[in-house]
């Protein structure tokens, strides 16, 4: 059986607590930026929320969650949004 130093275990647990809080702060900051970007992107394309959802292959409710900052889109969804932003004609092709 492996001996575990109690002091080492305590310090390790404290580090996990401290770094967990830092990770959440970073995630929340990124999350806010992404969601604001999503709302701006959708409005910039001129698409209604239901058309934007259809282009991305998600529900209208999901787009509303992103825009209200309750849910973060996946990296694949973010990439598709950026492609649409770079090439607005792509959204029309995806709707066909």
Curated annotation (Swiss-Prot):
UniProt-listed InterPro entries: Cro/C1-type_HTH (IPR001387), HTH-type_reg/antitoxin (IPR052359), Lambda_DNA-bd_dom_sf (IPR010982)
One Pfam family it belongs to: HTH_3
Record carries keyword Magnesium: no
DNA-binding region (UniProt annotation): 49-68
The UniProt record lists the keyword Transcription regulation: yes
Ranges for domain HTH cro/C1-type: 38-91
Alphabetical keyword list: DNA-binding, Transcription, Transcription regulation
Domain of life according to the entry: Bacteria
Alphabetized GO MF terms: DNA binding
Name of the protein in question: Uncharacterized HTH-type transcriptional regulator YiaG
Species name: Escherichia coli (strain K12)
Source species taxonomy: Bacteria, Pseudomonadati, Pseudomonadota, Gammaproteobacteria, Enterobacterales
């Amino acid at each position: 059986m492996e001996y575990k130093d109690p002091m080492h275990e305590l310090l390790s647990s404290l580090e996990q607590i401290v770094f967990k809080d830092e990770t959440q702060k970073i995630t929340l900051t990124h999350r806010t930026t992404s969601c604001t970007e999503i709302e701006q992107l959708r409005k910039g394309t001129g698409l209604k929320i239901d058309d934007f959802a259809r282009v991305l292959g998600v529900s209208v409710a999901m787009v509303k969650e992103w825009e209200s900052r309750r849910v973060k889109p996946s990296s694949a969804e973010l990439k598709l949004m950026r492609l649409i932003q770079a090439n607005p004609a792509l959204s029309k092709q995806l709707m066909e």
